Amino acid sequence: MTNKVNSYGWKALIGSAVGYGMDGFDLLILGFMLSAISADLNLTPAQGGSLVTWTLIGAVFGGILFGALSDKYGRVRVLTWTILLFAVFTGLCAIAQGYWDLLIYRTIAGIGLGGEFGIGMALAAEAWPARHRAKAASYVALGWQVGVLGAALLTPLLLPHIGWRGMFLVGIFPAFVAWFLRSHLHEPEIFTQKQTALSTQSSFTDKLRSFQLLIKDKATSKISLGIVVLTSVQNFGYYGIMIWLPNFLSKQLGFSLTKSGLWTAVTVCGMMAGIWIFGQLADRIGRKPSFLLFQLGAVISIVVYSQLTDPDIMLLAGAFLGMFVNGMLGGYGALMAEAYPTEARATAQNVLFNIGRAVGGFGPVVVGSVVLAYSFQTAIALLAIIYVIDMLATIFLIPELKGKALD
């Protein structure tokens, strides 16, 4: 494969990034709309929170299901299924009449969302040359942050005028854009070649092959364990910080809603910078050194941030915190693409990342418990420990795969 990125590579990347951006946009607008939905449908706080929980549960299930299907039937084909599933059931959310039908619609929409990350990462990795593979993964990862930023900017402007039902309809728009972009794509060459070679497989065992390849031998099992640790820390730290910090800044430091929103925007911009930098760095110095550098940066920035008390400094420092805590999101796509063969690549991306997402869901609970028992500063400082564990996993479990030819 040439080192030059062709037009197909760019189309595959943009189609993947828009889909992942839809994921971030959808989850954040749901958070913004919870109070309005709860008031309109007379939901309890527990019922309102469960709409988010079941969206994530659906995403985990969808990630595993569609990852395996895309390794068998194709990246582009299955991404079409996921986007249609999301669009239909997000549209149905706009006409929900009560808690139970809305919960069902959100869960099924979440199943559609779950396939976006892993399949999109696999598609971009297979469409881009090895020399630029980490950059491609980081650009797809940036899609999530662009979606989050778009939701943070649009929801306060539109929600008062069109209501939560209208916002669900707005949430379908990125899905149509992603569908249009993908409708002009064919399957990656490496996938079609591998599919032809495996076309004679039809037994039940062969259909489970993509899962078996994640633990096919000791070396691969070791990598899979390491990636689960990395993605768990990634999601645990992200949700632990992003769910609680705005609340802390508002209640303890008197940040207004506008200033809390500004902190979110500054922090997300830092995350975007970190993801971009990680992709550039990983293609230059390697995946493993880049992870270790950002993990060390996360430890230092978390410890320093936990000691800050000046509101203005905390506002600006959020960018550096976000850069190191979330910048590593730009590396998982390339790492997993290089660690697993074509017939298991999307399965690996979705299964391993969604296991991490499931573990990360406990982040807000753990941080909240420590806040109640001690203080917010203590809770944030303790998060540094998980990044030390992250470093150990990288050192002992993750090999350097920079430039590896995909098989």
UniProtKB/Swiss-Prot annotation:
GO cellular component assignments: plasma membrane
Family (UniProt): Belongs to the major facilitator superfamily. Aromatic acid:H(+) symporter (AAHS) (TC 2.A.1.15) family.
Localisation: Cell inner membrane
Keyword Kinase: no
Keyword annotations from UniProtKB, A to Z: Cell inner membrane, Cell membrane, Membrane, Transmembrane, Transmembrane helix, Transport
Cytoplasmic side: 1-16, 70-77, 129-138, 182-224, 283-288, 334-357, 400-407
Domain of life where this protein originates: Bacteria
N-terminal signal peptide: none
Primary location: membrane
Single GO term (MF): carboxylic acid transmembrane transporter activity
Periplasmic topological intervals: 38-48, 99-107, 160, 246-261, 310-312
Biological process terms in GO annotation: carboxylic acid transport
Species this chain originates from: Haemophilus influenzae (strain ATCC 51907 / DSM 11121 / KW20 / Rd)
Transmembrane segments: 17-37, 49-69, 78-98, 108-128, 139-159, 161-181, 225-245, 262-282, 289-309, 313-333, 358-378, 379-399
Alphabetized Pfam families for the sequence: MFS_1
Protein name: Putative metabolite transport protein HI_1104
Membrane topology: Multi-pass membrane protein
Transmembrane helix recorded as keyword: yes
